[in-house]
Amino acid sequence: MSEGRRVQAVISQDLLDRVLAIAGTQTILVGGQALAFWASYYRIDEPVAAISKDADFLGSRNDVDRFATGLNGVVRLSDRRMKTPLLGRVEVAISDMEYVHIDVLLEVFGDISQKAIRERSYAATIGTKTFKVMHPLDVLQGRLENVYGIKEKQDEHGVEQLKLAIQVVRAFVLAEASSDRTGANRSVILKHLNRIERMMLSDAGRKIAKRFGVHVADAMEFPGLATHSDFRTKRLPQIVTCMSPARIEELRKAAVLPAQPATSRPTKRPSHRRP
């Protein structure tokens, strides 16, 4: 079978589970599959256009070899002369016609350091196997900066992933608010909202909202904050100006925002003609 006739397939859940078992806690699941993990965790439907074909991990050169050995895959290394975050790629044949890619990265695109991603990552479990996955807010920032800074991501796939990441972060903030660990601590929720606010006010946040109509501010939820007078009168009005009309309407219906005042048509004054 010639190389040119083979096609890249979407990684199946069974194969992904095998990959995650091999990944362990040495690597961190990032990118589109990290987004898919959180969408599944919060029971959010993933649009077909948002599905990622491959799996990306933050890791080391040794991790490339671990994946290749565990999956009986072929290692494809990046040219060292090229400046690329890709340390290596493992190509796994799933049939004579199809293959999938497992990419191991030194860093992710955008203004997020490897150190910060590692420190904020979550440990997750499938069966008896534990692996690490990128923090939901890091996922959102990654999707935003991808659409903003990578031309190939400025398509339906990239935009749908950003929309999905916004939904995921909303679910995450609500879950944090109801958690026994963080729910009683309003400063934890404010910290998350502060980070979303920085994204929405960034050059990426503003330009993506203008060009694609996708508003990062829509990721905000305000559990326990909307009734706080200082927050409601000072910060909330500023945040709302960066939201989509649909999200503003949702918040009005939920009584988080005041209802739109009814507009009345001005009374037409009778004209006076001179006799």
Which residues does each predicted region cover?
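Compositionally biased terminal segments of proteins
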Residues: 1-275
